[in-house]
Amino acid sequence: MFNQHSVEIDWGGRPLKLETGKIARQADGAVVATYGETVVLATVVAAKSPREGVDFLPLTVDYQEKTYAAGRIPGGYFKREGRPTEKETLVSRLIDRPVRPLFADGWRNETQVIVTVLSHDMENDPDILAMVAASAALTLSGAPFKGPIGAARVGFINDEYVLNPTLDEIVDTQLDLVVAGTADAVLMVESEAKELSEEIMLKAVMFGHRHFQPVIDAIIELAEKAAKEPRELKVIDDTEIEKEMLGLVEQDLRAAYAIPVKQDRYAAVGKVKEKALAHFFPEGQEPKYDKLRVAGVFKELEAKIVRWNILDTGKRIDGRDVKTVRNIVAEAGVLPRAHGSALFTRGETQAMVVTTLGTGEDEQYIDSLAGTYKETFLLHYNFPPYSVGETGRLGGAKRREIGHGKLAWRAIRPVLPPHHEFPYTIRVVSEITESNGSSSMASVCGASLSLMDAGVPLKRPTAGIAMGLILEGERYAVLSDILGDEDHLGDMDFKVAGTEAGITSLQMDIKIAGITEEIMKVALGQAKDGRIHILGEMSKALDRARAELGEHAPRIETFKIPTDKIREVIGTGGKVIREIVEKTGAKVNIEDDGTVKVASSDGESIKAAIKWIKSIASDPEVGEIYEGTVVKVMEFGAFVNFFGAKDGLVHISQLAAGRVQKTSDVVKEGAKVKVKLLGFDDRGKTRLSMKVVDQETGEDLEAKQKAEGDAPREAAGE
C-alpha cells in the first residue's frame, strides 16, 4: 500500500531521519523529518498551471505548531489553535527566505509549503528541522527548485562552537545563530549575540555551513529514491525586447537614477516606463509582446542601470560612494508625556521610537510548545503606508512587521540590564514615519536612544546598519547604509547591529549563489566602521542613560517576605491585596518565592503599600510602641487594631493610670491611640497597654521612670 523511502544519518550526536511515501501522499512532495523525538511533517503542493497576471513567484510558506505535539491542550475558550503565533510567523519567514531565491526564473505557479510540528521532545527546537523537512519536500516535489538547502543552529559556549544546541544549552550560549544555504553558498543568516566580534560571527556562519553538508547529502540520497519528474518550465527568450528597450530608454533611466530624492526619482522612472509602454503598445495596433514580459524586462533593466553605475563609477543613486552613511539627525526626549522617546532620522528613513515602563502586571504571557513563560521586554515595529507616500489598509501586524520587530528586539536585548536589577516590563514601539531603506536598523538606533531617555541603564548604546552587495562576475561592491532601491535591485541584504564592543544581531539574505567568505568578511568590516560612525552621531543626542527615570514612569520597590506569609498578604479570594491596591493606589505583584514588587508614580503610595504589607508579613515585637485604632469597646477593655490586620486587647486595667470605672470613659470606637505590646497570653492572644504610653508624645513612660530612678544611684556610685 505504501511506497516508503527513508534516509537516516547521525547529525550533531543525534539521529536525523527523513521519510516519504506514507503520509500526505496526495501532496506533490511530503517528508516526515525526525530529530531526537521531535517530528515535523513538510508538504509541498504546486498548481498545475501558472497564475495569470503576476510577475512574481506566488510562494506561500506556513509553519504551524500543534499543542498535541507537546501533550498539551490549547488555552482559551475554544480549545483549538487559532491565528499564527509570533514564533510560527518567524519560522515561516525563516523557511521562506532561503528557498525563495532557488526557484527557477519564470516560475509563476502557486506553490504552498506547509510544515506541521507533530511531536516536540522539549530538547530540539523544531525550527531547524522544519527548514530541513521543507527543503526535502521541495526537492521531491518536481517543482523547479534549485536546491536542496541545509540549515543548522550554531551556539557559542565556553569559547567553542556547538552544533544544534538543545533548548537547555541555548540558555547559556553567547550566540544563537541560524544559517541556511546550499552545498556551495550561504543564503540566509539570523542571529542574536552577546557583543561578539566580527571574526567569531563569521566563523560561526562557516561552521554552520560545513556542518549541514551531511543533511544536503541525505536529501539528495532521498531524492534519488523518491523524487518526482521535474515539471516542465517554458523559458521565454526576451533578448529582442531587451535590445529594443535598452536602445530606447537606457539614457533616460540613467538620468532618472541620478536623482537623489526618492519621490522625484520614482516620478522620473515612472515617466520613462510610460515612454517604454507607449512604444511597445501603440494605440490602435496589435501588441507584439505580452505586457507582463515587457514590464519584467524594464524592471531588469532598472537593476542593471543601478548596478552598472555603482561598479563603473563607484557612485550610488543618491551620489554617495560605497562606504558613506547618509546624514543622521538623532533627537531624544521628543514626546512630553512618554517615559522615553527618540526621533532617529537617517536620510529619507525616519523612526519615532517610544519606550514605556510597566510593572509585573504588564508582562506578556507566551504560550509555547515548551510551556508558558513571561516576557518582560517587548519591541513592536509599525510600518504605516504613509511612510512610503502610499495609501493602504491599517490592521494587525503583518509578517514583515513582526520579523523586523524581532530583529530589533534581538539587537537590543543583549544590552538590557538583568531583570532582578531593573524589575520593569519594558515596551518599545517603533513607528516608521519615513522609509527609504533600513527602517529596522533605524528602529534599533531609535530604540537605544529612547530606552536611555527613559532611564533604562543599557550596558552600551546600540546601533544598526544595513549593507548591500552588487556582484557581477569577479567584480563586486559592498554598500553601506543601503537605500530601498539598492535593497531591491542588489544581491544581498546584510543587517548588522551592535555596540562599540561587538555584534548583538546579524541578519543576512542573499539572492544569488557565489557570496564567498571573503566578501562576507569585507561586508562585516565595513559594517563595523559604519556602526561606529552612527554611534558617534547618536551620542550627540544622548550617550548614556539618564540618571533618573522619566517623570511619568512608575517607580518600583522590591523586597521579600516569608513565603508562609504570602497567603495572609493576598487574603481570601485576594481580598487583602485588593484593599491595599485600592487604598494606596500602588500596584502590587507577589511572586512565589516571596519577592514583592510595589509600583507607583507616587512615592507616598509606594511607602504606604510597603508599610501595610510588612505589617501583615512580619510579627510585632514585644516592648515596641505602635499607633492603633480602637475597633471595639467592651466592659473588660478595648480591642485595638495596631499592626496591619492584627488586633490586640487593652484590658480595662491597662487603659489609664488609676482605677477606670467604664471602658467608654477612656476610649471610643474609632479613636486613635498609642499602645505598647506587653506580650501574649497562654492562648496566644495579644496583650496591649495604653497607660504606660504618653498618648500625646508616644513616649514609653515605664522606660522613662526606670531611667529617672536609675540616675541618682549611678551618680552616687561615681
From Swiss-Prot:
Keywords: Cytoplasm, Magnesium, Metal-binding, Nucleotidyltransferase, RNA-binding, Transferase
Subcellular location: Cytoplasm
Record-linked Gene3D superfamilies: GHMP Kinase, N-terminal domain, K Homology domain, type 1, Nucleic acid-binding proteins
EC number: 2.7.7.8
SMART domains linked to this entry: KH (SM00322), S1 (SM00316)
Pfam hit, one: PNPase
Binding site for Mg(2+): 487, 493
Uppermost EC category: transferase
Cofactor: Mg(2+)
Residues annotated as domain S1 motif: 623-691
Compositionally biased intervals (Basic and acidic residues): 701-718
HAMAP family: PNPase
Function field: Involved in mRNA degradation. Catalyzes the phosphorolysis of single-stranded polyribonucleotides processively in the 3'- to 5'-direction.
Family: Belongs to the polyribonucleotide nucleotidyltransferase family.
Classification via PANTHER family: POLYRIBONUCLEOTIDE NUCLEOTIDYLTRANSFERASE, POLYRIBONUCLEOTIDE NUCLEOTIDYLTRANSFERASE 1, MITOCHONDRIAL
Protein name according to UniProt: Polyribonucleotide nucleotidyltransferase
Encoding gene (name): pnp
